[in-house]
C-alpha cells in the first residue's frame, strides 16, 4: 500500500515504484540454459537477447499503465467522498477539518507520486513509431517461427505447425515489429504448453486484414515446472495463470497488444483454462489506416 506521508514516505514510495519497474524490465526474461543453444551463432544470440529486451520493456510499460489506472480510481473516490464529508461536518470542528485536510493532502501526494514515478516513466516509450514498408506476410511469420524455435521450442520438443495460403499477400506495416509480436505469441504458447506439444500458427486474410492466430493447449503444470526450460521469469508465468478481467491480457503479451494497436488493429487472448484449448489472435489492416 502506498504511503501518503510527506517527505520520506513520498521518496520511499517513488523509489519502490521505480525499483519494481526496473525489476520487471530486468528480470522478465532469463536466458535458457539448455545445452541445445550453447553453440548458437553470435548473431542469433544477439537477436534473441534483443527480442527479450523488447518484450520486457513493453511488459514494464503495461504494468505501469495498470498501476496508474488501478490506483487512480480509488484515489478519485477518496477525494470525492472527502468533499461530501466536508458538507456534512461542522465547519467549526477544528479536528474534523484537519482530518479532511489530511485526507486531501494524502490523495494529492499519491497522485503526484503516480505522475512522477509512473506516468513520466511510461512517457518515454508511450508512443510506438512504425517503420512502415510493403512486405509479403509470409516473411515475418517465417522469421518469428525460426526465432521461437531457437528461443525455447526446440528445448521443449515443441512442434510449431504453420498453416498459411497467403504468404505472398503484401501488407503495409512495420515488418520487424510484427515479427516481434508473432514471436512473443509463439514463445508464450510454448511456455503455456506441455513438453513435446504441438502449437499451431494460422496466417490468413480476413476483411482486408492480416490475421494471425496461435493455438495451444494450456498446461499450468508446464508453466510452473521449474525443471523445464523457460524463457519467462517465474513471476511472469505465475501472473499468466491468474484469472483476468474482461478485456485484459497477460502481462507477457503487452508487445503484440501494443504493436497491433499501433497498426490500427487488435489483439485478443482467449481465457486460459488448464487443459483446454486457448488462442492468441492478432489482426492488422493490410493497408495503412
Question: What function would you assign to each model-found segment?
Answer:
Residues 86-94:
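Short acidic helix/loop segment immediately C-terminal to the autophosphorylated histidine
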Residues 105-110:
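Short alpha-helical segment of the dimerization/phosphotransfer core of two-component systems
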Residues 131-146, 179:
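A conserved beta-strand-to-alpha-helix junction within the catalytic ATP-binding
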Residues 131-136, 159-169, 176:
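Conserved catalytic submotifs in the C-terminal HATPase_c
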Residues 222-237:
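Short conserved segment of the HATPase_c
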Residues 264-272:
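Glycine-rich ATP-binding loops of the HATPase_c
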